[in-house]
Amino acid sequence: MSKPLLEVSACYRSFQAGEQQLTVLKDINLSIARGEMVAIVGASGSGKSTLMNILGCLDKPSKGSYFIDGQDTSQMDVDELAKLRREHFGFIFQRYHLLGDLNAVGNVEVPAVYAGKDRLERRERAESLLSRLGLGERLDHKPNQLSGGQQQRVSVARALMNGGDVILADEPTGALDSHSGEEMMRLLQELHREGQTIIIVTHDMHVAQHADRIIEIKDGVIISDEPNPASNIAAAPKTEVIPAKTKARARVAAWDRYAEALKMALLAMSTHRLRTFLTMLGIIIGIASVVSVVALGEGSQREILKSISSMGTNTIDIRPGSGFGDRRSARVRTLTASDANALKNLPYVDSVTPSIGSSATVRYGNKAVTATVNGVGPEFFRVRGYELAQGQFWDDDSVNALAQDAVIDENTRKQLFPNSSGAMNSAIGEVIFLGDLPVRIIGVTQPKESAFGNSDALNVWVPYTTVSGRMVGKKYLDGITVRLDESVPSNAAEQGIISLLKMRHGTQDFFTINTDTIRQNIEKTTATMTLLISAIAVISLVVGGIGVMNIMLVSVTERTREIGVRMAVGARQSDILRQFLIEAVLVCLCGGALGVALAYLIGVVFAQAGGSFQMIYSTTSIVAAFACSTLIGVLFGFLPARNAARLDPVDALARE
């Protein structure tokens, strides 16, 4: 005698009902051979559905053993049972249990997706099965576009998809009219004749008469197990062989499962568009806030650094005394032109300018204004980054000759020569008086912003020797400004300058102002403020993540039956986990994309509104935004996805 396909021995199944234990199946002993057509008959509450669930590996006995083709299922985990369902069983449910978002072909393909079949192969097989069952013209119809009988035939095709050994039909005619019910039974008999093992679970003895063996169950006990003399259907040996998966095919199958999960996630999102958008809203606001804040911080920082650069890029100012506010600084007279010449010879110094400042009344004709007269060297304009609008700068010869040549700024030109903007009315060559000293204008600088915006100060620059010898009569300097080579670290250069001057003076009777230190401090301050505001914006992301988790928990509850169907046709726990996790991540990624788009829109509005600087968007912040979206999807989507994956398939299928 050949080994039975299914064998149940001394099977008990108990459930906890409050403080009592309810035993639904008692000492069930049953074997079913390959190719049999068996009907399990019993009234409601008799235990027939529980027995079917055990036979179909949806449930496990509390005690006893169950063998499938010689394999003991008692020690198998949930994924091993899922594999048995994929390879050995096909389910036909009373209520069809089709997935409403998929068409007929899509529903039939589901078991093959989890079995890892090639996409083209499974589609061809699904279409072939549906055509064979008379649904060739309904391939693209969704369940709500099909009649009850047509939906049941789709479920039959789904049961046959993986070519399993056993078809389990739970009340296959229960939801059909009499005509459709008879058609269904003829279809099952036809499948039996082709060698399929059929197990029908029903309360209707008329339906059971179509089987060649009838098992009657009552109060959890088999009371009869007899052949049906009225049946004369001979089963042919089943010859269909499902090809084994290779490693390469397994990799493609894994990708197909991801693609299927992505498709289902998109379908779920499109089905509940408003809810999905509201779920995304927290993510959108959070991502837009973070990206916008970073862009604002970067833009403002660049603007401030640009303003600082207007004072002279990479410069060090040297002043007498110990620091700002030192009352003794006026008595320190050790900074001289020879110090400036010594500094100029340092290898890391680009240019140097001495400086002597004075305030004077500047007169031209009947116009008189108060301006700052700056005695500087010929390299001053390079050090400070000034450019000419008209004329020229003076040179070393002018310095040595105490030349009475002057360069004025745009503000001074406007005050003294309001009509001299054109070349025909240029201020060049005009003579003005600095106090009582006449000087000739040889150049006009272009307008230049100060470190903190436009300056209205009036500036006149003349050789420092002229100021020293012809105006103030002092031999010492008010300060020296050094521009460093761009490739040299400013802190190291600053220490070199201090060491040289200390050696020359014998003491440190001066202090330095390093613009690079100012720049670094501003960068740190801006980064700190950006981090602070971003941290506040991240709260919105967390709130959005909680919203995603909440909606995903609702989605799991709404789609419990779908989860049960997927498990019944062979989905692993990892497949269910992946599907809901991908959906959560997809919601967050879409929210992240919309958030970045909103941030760019904010930038456009900011520019149109006349912002004082431009928002600078960085690739890093955008990549970080998407990484953050993905992380939120994983973190807040994991709990709902895990809950879905841990659902009991029997409970899930029974959920309304």
Swiss-Prot record:
Domain ABC transporter: 6-244
Alphabetized GO MF terms: ATP binding; ATP hydrolysis activity; transmembrane transporter activity
Alphabetical list of Gene3D superfamilies matching this protein: P-loop containing nucleotide triphosphate hydrolases (3.40.50.300)
This enzyme's EC code(s): 7.6.2.-
The keyword Lyase is annotated on this UniProt entry: no
One Gene Ontology term, aspect cellular component: plasma membrane
Binding locations of ATP: G42, A43, S44, G45, S46, G47, K48, S49
Record-annotated membrane-spanning stretches: 277-297, 531-551, 586-606, 621-641
A Pfam match: FtsX
PANTHER family in alphabetical order: MACROLIDE EXPORT ATP-BINDING_PERMEASE PROTEIN MACB, MEMBRANE COMPONENT OF TRANSPORTER-RELATED
Known function: Part of the tripartite efflux system MacAB-TolC. MacB is a non-canonical ABC transporter that contains transmembrane domains (TMD), which form a pore in the inner membrane, and an ATP-binding domain (NBD), which is responsible for energy generation. Confers resistance against macrolides.
UniProt protein name: Macrolide export ATP-binding/permease protein MacB
Gene: macB
